[in-house]
Amino acid sequence: MVRAKRKLDHIEYALSTGQSRTHGFHDIEFVHQSLPNSSYETITCETKIGELSLSSPIFINAMTGGGGEKTLHINEQLAYVAKHHNLAMAVGSQMAALKDESEAASYKIIRKVNPNGIFFANLGSEATVEQAERAVDMVGANALQIHLNVIQELTMPEGDRDFTGVLQRIEEIVLNSKVPVIVKEVGFGMSKETMQQLASVGVTAIDIGGQGGTNFAAVENERRQRMLSYFNNWGIQTATSIIEATSTNNNLSFIASGGIQTALDVAKAIALGANTTAFAGYFLRILMEDGIEKLVDEIDLLHTDLKFIMTALGAKTIEELQSVPLVIKGETYHWLTQRGIDTTHYSRR
């Protein structure tokens, strides 16, 4: 019951605290092209994460599950939206269902709604190989997300305090998993050092989960008597984390998430090097406040606007969008300079 109550608390406080929008994309500007030699009607948006082919560079990221009927209904609606738009979708952490079988229905519902969809299972970095296998089987997953959430756990009143052995556990899961493993942050971003460590143990896909969206330190602080306010502004902004990712020069696929709300955010994330982008808090707010049809319409508009932007830039495919010139300014440029990451190739390609 404690875990289920926490799941419901997370939904409530995620909606009430909102998204910070401190993702850093305001520091990224495209170089205008007056002769793009492109046509809106021929723009294609297919992309890949590793060996997984996706019809869109937008997918529905992990949100919830394991909180009884309310979370079942949310996942049911999200699965419908994913089916309508042929989007990939991740479920929230399944540890609740591994510990309490009665909660499994709130995750399994997605396959009932969308039998042929692409779904990602989800567990924390404390998971064992056996738990990872059960989570994948529970939803017939095409991939497994392992989330890293140190700051959230430290801020959580009942959270973990021991993070030793995490890389070794991830390596064991990667070696034994029958589906691709995606390691993701939950809103605090990833450094190039972390990504290099993950690549060294065989991880091939990373969701950078940057600062700028739902702030889980702020969410957990709402649940505390004594706030750990120093964690509320902790992390690496989404735009910065994408560039840190691409600077590693590893053969990794990258998912950009963290405050992404617009087609321009999507285009900038991909142009910086992401293979796809993920929405969570923004979609949840629309669903909860305006309903499922409004969310369906919003995703239609996102795809339309993304194709407009790609047409303006002369990028006929997602791969071409990854090579358009752009300029990095402001705090993002300052951070990257201090970190020894050269940005000139973005503006001169």
From Swiss-Prot:
Compartments (UniProt record): Cytoplasm
Enzyme Commission designation: 5.3.3.2
Lineage: superkingdom: Bacteria
Chief location: cytoplasm
Binding-site positions, FMN: 62-64, 93, 122, 184, 214, 258-259, 280-281
Biological processes per GO annotation: isoprenoid biosynthetic process
GO cellular component, one term: cytoplasm
InterPro entries registered for this protein in UniProt: Aldolase_TIM, FMN-dep_DH, IPdP_isomerase
Any one GO MF annotation of this record: isopentenyl-diphosphate delta-isomerase activity
Keywords tagged on the record: Cytoplasm, Flavoprotein, FMN, Isomerase, Isoprene biosynthesis, Magnesium, Metal-binding, NADP
HAMAP family linked: Idi_2 (MF_00354)
Family, per entry: Belongs to the IPP isomerase type 2 family.
Quaternary structure and interacting proteins, as annotated: Homooctamer. Dimer of tetramers.
Protein name, per record: Isopentenyl-diphosphate delta-isomerase
Source organism (scientific name): Bacillus anthracis
This protein's encoding gene: fni
